[in-house]
Structures are given as structure tokens and as C-alpha cells.
Design a protein with these regions (language model features):
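Active-site cores that bind ATP or allylic diphosphates and position pyrophosphate for catalysis
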Residues: 1-74
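Small-molecule kinase domains that catalyze NTP-dependent phosphoryl transfer to phosphate-bearing small molecules
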Residues: 15, 182-185, 190-238, 246-269, ...
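P-loop (Walker A) phosphate-binding loop of NTP-binding proteins
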Residues: 83
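ATP-binding Walker
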Residues: 86
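Walker A/P-loop
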Residues: 89
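Conserved substrate/cofactor phosphate-moiety recognition/catalytic segment
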Residues: 93-142, 146
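ATP-dependent NMP and nucleoside kinases share a basic, alpha-helical "lid"
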Residues: 118-124, 141-201, 207
Length: 278
């Protein structure tokens, strides 16, 4: 027996015409109660809408605004995935250059080949090793995102489950925008100056994605780009228009993609499926 008495705290509400907080038991029939739901609060913070003075102390509101910045101030990860030769790295470098012009957030390019050399040395190309490599890439991207930077990943990342793991890891801290570079196999093969596709087809090398190892196409990517159907500048317009639509990029001088460049076959927006990151 420790003789503790449980104390209850009555629910308090703000009554506008009385400019006071009352318990629900003290309300009159004609009292007008003001209320902000959790969803409304998140939306107000996300869009930098002013919160009413009665909601909280100014210092607390300022702390909330600092802790939950709008999307265009949050960190996010752009994750380019596709076959070898699809144009992932070229697009990633072009996006990095354009984002760096804004100079509002740190932009870091994480190229798959560089990650393999520096973080995944010793790993092979079995499914297990490839998944480990992609998850390491995702961890670095999540740390960049957590500190409100922009991570740009360019990796074949052939398996859905590993990419899903990375998405979940990153979305703890910010946005995750998966960009499927869906350039056709024959086009990718024609761009292969090293002849790796031919060697894989001849059996000289094994475990090559798209030949004797599967590439599992993304199920619901935020963007789909086919570099055989558009130039790099056109693809950039699609990507940055997508970032604006999703709320992660603000630039009043940005060129909006034309209807000709944004056919359904070239780009698919699934912003409605984005996880609420606040």
C-alpha cells in the first residue's frame, strides 16, 4: 500500500466569445468552442500557416515550427533505379547540379558504383550481397535526410524488397521519391560501351541484371522516366515539376513541364500515396 491517489485532469477547451479556457463541464449551451485537430496542426505547420494566439505560447509554437518544417525545407532522398545503361547516373548528376544552384540545402550524390567501392568492398553480386549494398546506401541516404539534406541515389537496386526497406528507413526523417528510369532493355544494351550485356548473354559473366538475374520493376514509383523518349533537359523538367507537385522544391522561376513532355507514358505521379512525413 503506497497510498497513491489518482488525479484526473478535466478536458479544457477554448471558448472564443469568453476568450478563456473552460472545462467541458463548465460550458454553456451557446458557447462556441475553438479547436485544432492533430491533422489540422500538421497541415498548418507544413504550409507555414499562422496558428491562433490561443492555441499555445509563442515559444511553443516557434519550437513546433522549427521541429516540423514545411516540405520544401525538409530533407529528402531521390532514389534513381533502373537497368545498367538506363541513364540513372546521368540524370542524378544533372539533378544534383540544378539543386545545388538553389544553395538552400546540402546536396549529396550517392552513386551505386562509388558506394560499392567505398562502403561495400568485398560484397559480391548474390541477392544477399546486393540487398546489403542497397541497404547500406539507404542508411547513408537516411542520415543525410535526417539532417535536412538532399540525398540523390543512383543504383540498379534490382529487388523490390530492398528498395521498400530503404523507403521505410528514409521516411522516418523526410521524403523518399523513387524514380524508375524505365529505359527499354534494347536501348540500355545499345549504350553499353563495355560490352557487359553481350558478355552476360554469352555466359562470360553471370548474375547480370536484366539478362540472367531479374530486375523487379518498382510497384508505385513517384516518377517514371524513359530516357529513350526524352532529352536530359526534358527529363529534368519532369523531375522538378514532380518535386514541386510533391512540395519538396520551390522555385518561382522554374519551368513547368509541357503537356507534350508529361504524357502518362513518360511520368506517373503517385503523390497521393506518399507517406505523411510530419
Amino acid at each position: 500500500e503506497i497510498e497513491l491517489e489518482v488525479m484526473t485532469c478535466p478536458k479544457m477547451v477554448y471558448v472564443k466569445q469568453k476568450d478563456d479556457f473552460l472545462t467541458t463541464d463548465e460550458l454553456d449551451a451557446n458557447d462556441r468552442v475553438e479547436n485544432i485537430s492533430g491533422t489540422a496542426l500538421r497541415q498548418a505547420l507544413q504550409h507555414r500557416h499562422a496558428l491562433p494566439d490561443w492555441f499555445s505560447f509563442p515559444e511553443i509554437i516557434q519550437t513546433l515550427q522549427t521541429a516540423y518544417p514545411p516540405k520544401h525545407e525538409q530533407g529528402f532522398t531521390l532514389f534513381f533505379t533502373g537497368l545498367s545503361g538506363s541513364g540513372k547516373s546521368t540524370l542524378a548528376k544533372a539533378v544534383q547540379a540544378k539543386l545545388s544552384e538553389a544553395n538552400t540545402r546540402t546536396v549529396t550524390l550517392l552513386d551505386g558504383d562509388v558506394i560499392r567501392k567505398n562502403l561495400s568492398a568485398g560484397l559480391g553480386f548474390s541477392k544477399k550481397d546486393r540487398d546489403i549494398n542497397v541497404k547500406r546506401l539507404g542508411y547513408v541516404a537516411s542520415e543525410i535526410t535526417k539532417h535536412r539534406g538532399i540525398a540523390i541515389c543512383a543504383s540498379i537496386a534490382p529487388y523490390v524488397e530492398a528498395r521498400r526497406f530503404v523507403r521505410k528507413q528514409v521516411e522516418q526523417y523526410g521524403g523518399f521519391i523513387e524514380i524508375y528510369v524505365a529505359t527499354p532493355f534494347d536501348v540500355c544494351k545499345s549504350r553499353d560501351i563495355k560490352g557487359l550485356y553481350q558478355q552476360a548473354e554469352e555466359g562470360v559473366i553471370t548474375g547480370f541484371t536484366g539478362v540472367d538475374d531479374p530486375y523487379e520493376a518498382p510497384e508505385q514509383p513517384e516518377l517514371v522516366i524513359d530516357t529513350s523518349q526524352m532529352t536530359i533537359p526534358e527529363a529534368l523538367e519532369v523531375i522538378f515539376h514532380g518535386l514541386q507537385q510533391l512540395g519538396f522544391y520551390e522555385n518561382n522561376c522554374a519551368t513547368y513541364v509541357s503537356q507534350r513532355h508529361a504524357s502518362k507514358k513518360q511520368v506517373q505521379f503517385v503523390a497521393e500515396n506518399m507517406t505523411d512525413i510530419i
